[in-house]
């Protein structure tokens, strides 16, 4: 069997369930290398090391940010030398893993990441050098995911983002910008911007419910009203029609703004005044369950 490399977020290095799951894989006679990340850049170094270890699968063990870092590192390799991506969800929200129906039980998830079916999936590229596998969010949602206290996330998981958002409703502020893509043009003040390769963000909120990870497209969703709560937020996440929610499905987008705005790319912040975002079809292989709802 080909070798597998698990890149594990340092916060989970002492997790006894992870240790037991790794032991069980090795007891089957499979080769599973483990590397621990402690700072930004470690994942890229370990992905580069994968080539010398004859690794066919690199597993991202952590949350959405860890998955992003590993997927981004894979894109730095030549296409014919890229290992397959596996996912061991260990974060607060685990939005991409949950959206894919990847088991949240550590033993089951690791077995899938090692042995599961490899499927070609899309990645989104931002300004030619940054990537996201799940979603880019801007506006109020970005500020909430960035500012939610770690202790609240640890105690409540994904619902912590929603609770912290309710606490910060007095700080609502829209971002002025222009957005255009194929047959789509919009300008105005956006309170929430969601650009989805995957469907959900912020701990399970279906921000881009029509998105798929293998269709060569991304879903744009804008919330433009300020007189929203709670009705318009309910509309945004429950799929009801509302004049303040704008949808588009496109292969690329250009976003320009008079002032700096910040997007979270799978939780990783990127600020600027111009963003070119495009889908790279079938960019990487990912081990996914047969019932993955993000596949078309």
UniProtKB/Swiss-Prot annotation:
<dbReference type="InterPro" id="IPR017438">
    <property type="entry name" value="ATP-NAD_kinase_N"/>
</dbReference>
<feature type="domain" description="DAGKc">
    <location>
        <begin position="1"/>
        <end position="130"/>
    </location>
</feature>
<comment type="function">
    <text>Probably phosphorylates lipids; the in vivo substrate is unknown.</text>
</comment>
<keyword id="KW-0479">Metal-binding</keyword>
<dbReference type="InterPro" id="IPR001206">
    <property type="entry name" value="Diacylglycerol_kinase_cat_dom"/>
</dbReference>
<dbReference type="Pfam" id="PF19279">
    <property type="entry name" value="YegS_C"/>
</dbReference>
<feature type="binding site">
    <location>
        <begin position="63"/>
        <end position="69"/>
    </location>
    <ligand>
        <name>ATP</name>
    </ligand>
</feature>
<dbReference type="GO" id="GO:0008654">
    <property type="term" value="P:phospholipid biosynthetic process"/>
</dbReference>
<dbReference type="InterPro" id="IPR050187">
    <property type="entry name" value="Lipid_Phosphate_FormReg"/>
</dbReference>
<feature type="binding site">
    <location>
        <position position="212"/>
    </location>
    <ligand>
        <name>Mg(2+)</name>
    </ligand>
</feature>
<keyword id="KW-0067">ATP-binding</keyword>
<feature type="binding site">
    <location>
        <position position="37"/>
    </location>
    <ligand>
        <name>ATP</name>
    </ligand>
</feature>
<keyword id="KW-1208">Phospholipid metabolism</keyword>
<keyword id="KW-0418">Kinase</keyword>
<dbReference type="GO" id="GO:0000287">
    <property type="term" value="F:magnesium ion binding"/>
</dbReference>
<keyword id="KW-0444">Lipid biosynthesis</keyword>
<feature type="binding site">
    <location>
        <position position="215"/>
    </location>
    <ligand>
        <name>Mg(2+)</name>
    </ligand>
</feature>
<feature type="active site" description="Proton acceptor">
    <location>
        <position position="268"/>
    </location>
</feature>
<dbReference type="GO" id="GO:0005524">
    <property type="term" value="F:ATP binding"/>
</dbReference>
<dbReference type="GO" id="GO:0005737">
    <property type="term" value="C:cytoplasm"/>
</dbReference>
<dbReference type="InterPro" id="IPR022433">
    <property type="entry name" value="Lip_kinase_YegS"/>
</dbReference>
<keyword id="KW-0443">Lipid metabolism</keyword>
<dbReference type="InterPro" id="IPR045540">
    <property type="entry name" value="YegS/DAGK_C"/>
</dbReference>
<dbReference type="Pfam" id="PF00781">
    <property type="entry name" value="DAGK_cat"/>
</dbReference>
<protein>
    <recommendedName>
        <fullName>Probable lipid kinase YegS-like</fullName>
        <ecNumber>2.7.1.-</ecNumber>
    </recommendedName>
</protein>
<keyword id="KW-0808">Transferase</keyword>
<feature type="binding site">
    <location>
        <position position="217"/>
    </location>
    <ligand>
        <name>Mg(2+)</name>
    </ligand>
</feature>
<feature type="binding site">
    <location>
        <position position="92"/>
    </location>
    <ligand>
        <name>ATP</name>
    </ligand>
</feature>
<comment type="similarity">
    <text>Belongs to the diacylglycerol/lipid kinase family. YegS lipid kinase subfamily.</text>
</comment>
<dbReference type="InterPro" id="IPR005218">
    <property type="entry name" value="Diacylglycerol/lipid_kinase"/>
</dbReference>
<keyword id="KW-0963">Cytoplasm</keyword>
<dbReference type="GO" id="GO:0005886">
    <property type="term" value="C:plasma membrane"/>
</dbReference>
<keyword id="KW-0460">Magnesium</keyword>
<dbReference type="GO" id="GO:0001727">
    <property type="term" value="F:lipid kinase activity"/>
</dbReference>
<keyword id="KW-0547">Nucleotide-binding</keyword>
<keyword id="KW-0594">Phospholipid biosynthesis</keyword>
<dbReference type="InterPro" id="IPR016064">
    <property type="entry name" value="NAD/diacylglycerol_kinase_sf"/>
</dbReference>
């Amino acid at each position: 069997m080909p070798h597998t490399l698990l890149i594990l977020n340092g916060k989970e290095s002492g997790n006894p369930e992870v240790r037991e799951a790794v032991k069980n894989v090795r007891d089957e006679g499979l080769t599973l290398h483990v590397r621990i990340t402690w700072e930004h850049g470690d994942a890229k170094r370990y992905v580069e090391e994968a080539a010398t270890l004859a690794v066919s699968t690199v597993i991202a063990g952590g949350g959405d940010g860890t998955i992003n870092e590993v997927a981004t590192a894979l894109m730095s390799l030549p296409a014919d030398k890229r290992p397959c991506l596996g996912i061991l969800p260990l974060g607060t929200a685990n939005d991409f893993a949950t959206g894919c129906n990847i088991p949240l039980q550590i033993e089951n998830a690791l077995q899938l990441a090692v042995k599961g079916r490899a499927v070609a999936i899309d990645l989104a590229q931002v300004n030619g050098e940054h990537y996201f596998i799940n979603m880019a969010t801007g506006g109020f949602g970005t500020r909430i995911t960035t500012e939610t206290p770690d202790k609240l996330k640890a105690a409540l998981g994904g619902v912590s983002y929603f609770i912290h958002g309710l606490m910060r409703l007095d700080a609502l502020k829209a971002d002025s910008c222009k957005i255009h893509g194929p047959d789509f043009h919009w300008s105005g003040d956006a309170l929430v911007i969601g650009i989805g390769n995957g469907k959900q963000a912020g701990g399970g909120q279906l921000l881009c419910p029509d998105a798929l990870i293998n269709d060569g497209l991304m879903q744009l969703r804008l919330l433009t009203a300020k007189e929203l709560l709670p009705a318009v937020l309910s509309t945004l996440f429950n799929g009801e029609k509302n004049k303040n929610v704008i949808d588009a499905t496109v292969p690329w987008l250009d976003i320009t703004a008079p002032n700096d705005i910040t997007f979270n790319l799978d939780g990783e912040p990127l600020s600027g005044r111009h963003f070119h975002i495009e889908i790279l079809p079938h960019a990487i292989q990912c081990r996914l369950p047969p019932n993955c709802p993000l596949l078309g």
